[in-house]
């Protein structure tokens, strides 16, 4: 990364960082896409089981990844402030947190989750598939969190192409393992939907291996000496990471868990509806890679410029990100509307299920416009290290507004589609409130910068 002066130079740097991130996110989300489609091709029960299992793993995955992503703005600001020597200790303390979280999650999976599954309104077969799917994921949980830290370290330096290479190398391996474990090919056991969990868990370890190799072979990464001895546990650094990471993780948890809660509530409408909801939701997840990548890019660039005390440049990047996200939202909405029948055909050959998926995809258009406003704002706030309020707003918007609205509408003629209208309502409310917040934060940072200049 480097300082830019003109809007043209800023657009170029924005796209240089954004493009590899979006390719990475699309490739990562394709893992979920292939888990869903390949399980659906095995059976509707397998698809429903993966949907329930994913409803447990997805919010935990996203929330703890969000917590660990706290090192991205921390390192970006350190680089902007030319304090590179502090980067190694930040990464190491992030790894300590990652391993602790992995241990806790594995315990919860084996001690708590089975009991929850037995009390859910799904068949015993679907619950069993979900349980074995999660057991497979557990194989790779430590690796997943380690790779999250390493990815955040790499991205915070603006070297997003390296992360892209890591992902492009490993996801085809995941698809191959799905083919082996789900359908029992090449002498592997036929595990149905649960097999996708084991394939994903094993793939996470390959991600770590490739990450370590690239960090050790790339000069711009190797110079930080990440793997040259361990640094001491520093509670001040742990506190900083947690202080930013917990609100950030909660924000993501409240958003992803609301979708998981809706998946569980869909159980009242039957296995077919769960399968259709999960199929349409996986498409939305894939498309969400674009606004999410805008947010990640703004976190990196905003953090870098804020660390260098160039708030005007950080604000200009936010405007660029907003313009990009709105354009992307319009394109995604058009794709969902005009190609919904083709998209549904990827998931099933069952006409009734295909029709349900197409109906969900129409309502998914609302998500695209809400995310176009919300994601850039969240990315900018993370770059500014202002994340405490976002978690509160997320809880109110999603759980106290979005879910009740959706629940109420589900008893009308809208049925299960009412939940998706409720979800969209929550996203729009959060986008409105946080758009006000980001402007106030920028005003505060501007005053602080001026005061620092006067005192110096």
From Swiss-Prot:
Its domain of life reads Bacteria
The record's keywords, sorted A to Z, are: Antiport, Cell membrane, Ion transport, Membrane, Transmembrane, Transmembrane helix, Transport
- A Pfam family assignment: MatE
Q: Where in the cell is it found?
A: Cell membrane
Main localization of the protein described in the UniProt heading: membrane
Among InterPro entries, the record links this protein to: MATE_fam (IPR002528), MATE_MdtK (IPR050222), MdtK-like (IPR048279)
Entry's Gene Ontology molecular function annotations: antiporter activity; xenobiotic transmembrane transporter activity
UniProt keyword Membrane present:
yes
Gene Ontology cellular component terms for the protein in this record: plasma membrane
Job description of the protein: Multidrug efflux pump.
Provide the family line: Belongs to the multi antimicrobial extrusion (MATE) (TC 2.A.66.1) family.
* Protein name from the UniProt record: Probable multidrug resistance protein NorM
């Amino acid at each position: 990364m480097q300082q830019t002066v003109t809007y043209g130079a800023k657009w170029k740097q924005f796209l240089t960082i954004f493009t590899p991130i979006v390719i990475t996110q699309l490739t990562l989300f394709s893992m979920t896409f292939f888990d869903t489609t390949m399980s659906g091709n095995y059976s509707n029960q397998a698809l429903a089981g993966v949907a329930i299992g994913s409803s447990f793993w997805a919010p935990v995955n996203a929330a703890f990844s969000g917590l660990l992503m706290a090192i991205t703005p921390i390192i970006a600001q350190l680089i902007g402030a030319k304090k590179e020597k502090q980067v190694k200790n930040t990464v190491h303390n992030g790894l300590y947190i990652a391993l602790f979280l992995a241990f806790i999650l594995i315990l919860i999976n084996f001690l708590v989750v089975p009991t929850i599954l037995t009390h859910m309104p799904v068949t015993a077969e679907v619950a069993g598939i979900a349980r074995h799917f999660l057991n497979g994921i557990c194989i790779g949980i430590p690796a997943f969190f380690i790779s999250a830290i390493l990815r955040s370290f790499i991205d915070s330096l603006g070297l997003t192409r390296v992360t892209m290479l890591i992902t492009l190398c490993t996801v085809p391996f995941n698809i191959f393992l799905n083919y082996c474990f789900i359908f029992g090919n090449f002498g592997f056991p036929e595990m149905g939907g649960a097999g996708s969990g084991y394939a994903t868990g094993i793939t996470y370890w390959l991600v770590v291996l490739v990450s370590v190799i690239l960090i050790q072979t790339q000069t711009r990464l190797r110079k930080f000496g990440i793997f040259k001895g361990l640094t001491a546990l520093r509670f001040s650094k742990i506190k900083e990471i947690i202080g930013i990471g917990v609100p950030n993780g909660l924000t993501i948890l409240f958003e992803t868990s609301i979708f998981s809660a809706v998946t569980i509530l869909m159980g009242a409408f039957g296995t077919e509806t769960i399968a259709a909801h999960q199929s349409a939701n996986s498409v939305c997840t894939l498309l969400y890679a674009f606004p999410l990548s805008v947010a990640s890019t703004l976190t990196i660039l905003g953090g870098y410029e804020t660390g260098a005390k160039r708030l005007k440049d950080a604000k200009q990047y936010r405007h660029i990100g907003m313009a990009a996200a709105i354009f992307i939202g319009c394109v995604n909405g058009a794709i969902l509307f005009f190609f919904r029948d083709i998209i549904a055909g990827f998931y099933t050959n069952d006409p009734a299920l295909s029709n349900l998926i197409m109906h969900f995809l129409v309502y998914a258009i609302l998500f695209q416009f809400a995310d176009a406003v919300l994601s850039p704002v969240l990315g900018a706030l993370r770059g500014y290290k202002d994340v405490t309020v976002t978690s509160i707003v997320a809880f109110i918007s999603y759980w106290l507004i979005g879910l009740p609205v959706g629940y109420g509408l589900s008893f009308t003629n809208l049925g299960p589609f009412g939940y998706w209208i409720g979800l969209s309502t929550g996203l729009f409310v959060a986008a409105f409130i946080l758009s006000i917040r980001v402007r106030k934060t920028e005003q505060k940072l501007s005053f602080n910068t001026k005061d620092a200049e006067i005192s110096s």
